[in-house]
Amino acid sequence: MPRRLPFLLALLCAAPALPAAAPAPVELSGDTLDLGLSTGGNLVYRGNARVTGADFRLSADEIRLEAATDTFHARGRVVLTLAGARLLAAELTLRRRDGRFEAREVRLGSPPYFATAAEASGTRAEVTLRGARVSLGEPGPWQPTLAAAELVVLPGKGIRTAGAALGVGDFRPLALRGARHDFDQPLPVSLGLGGGFRRSLGLFGEARALLPVRPGLGLGGELGIYTARGVMVGPAARYADPSADDRWNGTLSSGYIRDHGDRLTDLLGRPIAPDRGLLAWEHRQRTTGGTTIAAQLNWWSDSEVLRDFRPRAFFPVQVPDSFVEVAHPGPNSFLTFLTRLQPNRFHAVQERLPELRFDALPTPLALGIWQRGEASYARLREDPPAGGPRLAADRLDAYYALSRPWAPTPWFSFTPVLGGRLTHHANLRRGEERPGNQLRLLGEAGFDAALRLSGTFDVRDPVWKIDGLRHLLTPRLSYRHFPGADRGRGLIPRIDRQAFSTYLPPLGLGETRHLDDLRATRTFRVGLGNLLQTRDPAEGVRELLRLDLAGDLAVGPRPPEGRFAAVHTELSTRPAPWLELDALQVWSARGDGLREFNTGITLREGDRWSLRWGNNFLRRELEDYAVDGRARLREGLEFITRLQYDARRRRFNEQTYGLAFAVANTWLVTSSVSVYSGRKRESSFGFDLRVDALRF
């Protein structure tokens, strides 16, 4: 029959050895208790033997307590549970006086990490494993695994080793001279595999691996083998601040190939050379003083190298950018240094070599007046790769404005604005032309007015989870007038020029960025904002619908786009977790009708399935429709599809069908078949197989 000995007998034991050094009551129990001479006067519990303390539990087939040394000896199916970690062993010795232990044939885990070892020893603060093997997730043939002759575990903090082998299951081909990992940081190992077939590439296989070299630094490489093109290889890296502050991080990716396939021509119609390569570097940093640093470098040997070999990275951003920006906050201000480079010779880039800018944020003065300002110096260059005159200018610019908000009631506000902008262009160059220096002084006058109306409605619907409605209605009217802005327009090189945008441009002179392409402006902007909200038990307030309308009315000289160009409408609604709708509409007021219409509708049922339908319409430019779907067929297996239809050309530009499934809760395997139409460089058929890590 089980016997228990509550350890009020503190003369024998003062505390559990691993959990704490201070005395604490523990309890021993077992099926039988042996106090005979054969035990040397020691307490021996056999059969379901247990030691239970405040924050630990030890069980085994047999537990022996040596009173003279305050030592537990456990053997046979030993299990020690401590602070969320669990250790199993064939034998374990626990010395209470110094908190040290030794064990053999050890298995231990603290999710998601599990380890085995021939021997283990240490204390509560540090455990040394000999003949160790650590896996991410429960040990198995597909789990990421690290094996080491000796491994040091710092419970709750991390692990370190002087030498180890890394791989998957029993296949561990990667040797590490030394490794360290803090549990509060992402795993410093990055693995990715891919493969498939495309007519333009042939059969191909791709791999990327980053291994830890020191805390916060992973080095490795990228390898791509293409039967129709050759071998692309290059170094890769990822780095981050090893401290908990996470003050800086960055990535490096590269590749070089001697391309023996059909390379076709580049963006400018020029033949592509066989030696092809790319380099991408990104860096983000934040100092203790609040200074932020952002840098990005994208070098391509030709305009198509990323599209040919890494299309997933190409299609989201098809024009590379390279810059370094340093922003330092001051008292209600920012000082910014920006340099923008043109390392490639196939895209037009407005270079800044460099630009230094000071922004004074709105600051109150006397009588309720607010001031704001900015000043900058920029050395601008543009060398069009497709031909045309080389443009250059050194520009000194300053802007200052005063405003006086006036809100006689909570529902009405009126803010007059008065400002001025001084711009000096020097060292002008437009091809062989050398226009003289240009000095331009502009004045700005205007106002911003708004009405704020609201209403509440006692509406409840448990299906849509609506608990009352609040409608916020905000009519807005703004006006800006800055005459003479086109002065010197024919002499100033148009480097910072107006770009195409589907949204309304900034109205004020202080927000305008195309300083080399200004026009005289006298414009009213009329807007109407609608917001519908309901109570939410988790978030307090949940937004059900947002509908904004706005349009510009030009007075004075008629602009090229007309006095009332278009009405812009934006709609977003999320009335329920399973429904989302977003829309953007631009309606021309000149009798041309609909100019642009973009929508997106998403339906989902938890994690069982989701479907998104969207369209993009731009008059005389494009009209396409896209469907993205996902459905869970069973646990760990999903069906995915993407369809893109071009209504103007009456064809499917893309049809993709695939399956995604998890392996050992660690790897995501995605296989897909794609059929393309209309693309000039990609094959009409493609098969892809990708293996990505789910948990590291």
Where are the model-predicted features located?
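Structural recognition of beta-strand segments within beta-rich domains
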Residues: 27, 34-59, 64-75, 79-81, ...
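Boundary at the C-terminal end of the N-terminal hydrophobic targeting segment
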Residues: 17-23, 680
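Outer-membrane beta-barrel proteins and related beta-barrel translocases across Gram-negative bacteria
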Residues: 29, 33, 85-100, 107-128, ...
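Positively charged n-region of N-terminal signal peptides that target proteins for export
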Residues: 1-4
